[in-house]
Every structure is written in structure tokens, then in C-alpha cells.
Regions:
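Extended catalytic/binding region for NAD+/ADP-ribose chemistry, centered on the ART fold
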Residues: 40-73
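Active-site and NAD+-binding cores of ADP-ribose-processing enzymes
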Residues: 1-39, 74-231
């Protein structure tokens, strides 16, 4: 089906926090949960493809992956790339141990592709009819920018992600979108990306050691109100 969603392309490099040695490795299917997904916002509910999450700035990557450590009573689990969700249960709220940092790297890569801007007014208008059944099933009253950002029900945004994945170009054969661009719950200024497996192009991938003096890391810690135990 054709979808006619608003689309965009990466205007610069992508960043993500992932496991050492290569933060750009696709998650291993053996780590998928009972529902067949990795818990990501736009993961495939049918477990036929994986999704890689990134941000336009290092700050966004830090915010998304360290949100689990916030001391808030209702911690936000809307993350890009927590490879081991069990970490959330292992560490004290408000404190990130050094070994968590040591086992991860800041990834940088050049990305190319056509991505659906699902929060755009045109996209929301086009998607309302197509997602009606899922909205009813998951108790979503209205498809708006807020619904896309909600942490739960995650199954709804995963249904939406699969719908975008199945959209076709005007020729009726070629996939229309390589992934999704969306705004983070941590702020309108935090631009995030979800890349579908087998789509788009990632080149010049880098794996960088996380620098304790990184200003983006410091800002993320300040905004999240968490600390790293460097001892």
C-alpha cells in the first residue's frame, strides 16, 4: 500500500550508545523478549526484522539510553538502545556504575535513506485511518504527536512502525521508507531515528570510547539528574 507520509533524510551523522566493541551491531534475536521484540518503540511485533535506534546528537543518545537510571518514581523506559533491559533492575536509581559505561561505546555513523516523519501533521492525518483498529485494540483515543511519544502501550507504536515498514512507493513494489524519524520524549530538540533492518545505508561507522569529560554526557547527566560512579 502507498501511504504518502511526510518524509525526511538525515542531515548529518547519527549517534547511538551500544555495546563494546561495535555499537552498530544489530541486536541478537536471542535477546528478544517473550513478545518477540526488544522493547523498542518501533520494533516489529511479528519479529521479521530488527530496528536500530539512533539520535542526531550525542546528547540525544545519552538521554535515551540512560533514562532508566533516573530517580523518578515512574522511570521513563523510552530508550534507544538498552541492550540489556535487566540492567534497570541491577543498579540503584540515580546512579550509573562505571562498568555500565565501560561496557559501552558511543557510535557515530553517516546515514542515508528516506525516513517517515511520523509526527508531522501530514503523516498523522494519513495514519489515522490505517491505525484505527490498533488504536481501538490498545485503548488509544487519538492519534496525535503525544500518542507516538507515549511509553505505553508500546504495542501500538510497534504496530504503527510495522505499518510504515510495509508502505510502498508509487511504483507499488519498492519499500517507501527506510525507517522513522521522531521526536524524543526528552524534548522537541532531541531528534531520533529508527532504521529498519535491510533498509537505508550506514557508512563510516565509528566506535568511540565514552569520554568522562564529554560535554554532552555532562549535560545528559544534569538533565536526567543522575550521576556516574567513576570509582
Amino acid at each position: 500500500m502507498t501511504c504518502d507520509l511526510a518524509e525526511t533524510s538525515p542531515g548529518g551523522p547519527w549517534y547511538r550508545i551500544g555495546r563494546h566493541p561495535d555499537p552498530w551491531v544489530w541486536p541478537d534475536w536471542s535477546y528478544a523478549g517473550p513478545d518477540g521484540t526488544f522493547g523498542g518503540r518501533f520494533d516489529d511485533p511479528d519479529s521479521s526484522y530488527r530496528v536500530l535506534y539512533a539520535a542526531s546528537r550525542p546528547l540525544g543518545a545519552y538521554l535515551e539510553t540512560m533514562a532508566w537510571a533516573r530517580p523518578d518514581p515512574a522511570v521513563d523506559l523510552d530508550v534507544i538502545a538498552i541492550s540489556d533491559p535487566a540492567d534497570e533492575d541491577d543498579y540503584a536509581a540515580g546512579l550509573i556504575p562505571r562498568d555500565w559505561i565501560d561496557r559501552r561505546r558511543l557510535g557515530r555513523a553517516c546515514a542515508a535513506g528516506t525516513l517517515a516523519a511520523v509526527g508531522h501533521s501530514q503523516s498523522l492525518s494519513r495514519l489515522r485511518g490505517s491505525t484505527a483498529g490498533s488504536m481501538v485494540a490498545h485503548g488509544v483515543a487519538e492519534l496525535d504527536a503525544a500518542a507516538i511519544r507515549e511509553t505505553a502501550p508500546r504495542a501500538f507504536t510497534q504496530d504503527l512502525g510495522r505499518l510504515v515498514y510495509r508502505c510502498l512507493a508509487a511504483d507499488g513494489r519498492t519499500p517507501a521508507y527506510d525507517g522513522i524519524m521522531y521526536a524524543s520524549k526528552h524534548g522537541d530538540d532531541v531528534e531520533c531515528w529508527a532504521l529498519f533492518e535491510g533498509r537505508g545505508d550506514l557508512t563510516d561507522t565509528e566506535s568511540l570510547r565514552i569520554d568522562p569529560a564529554d560535554s554532552d554526557l555532562a549535560e545528559a547527566l544534569r538533565l536526567l539528574r543522575v550521576e556516574i560512579d567513576w570509582a
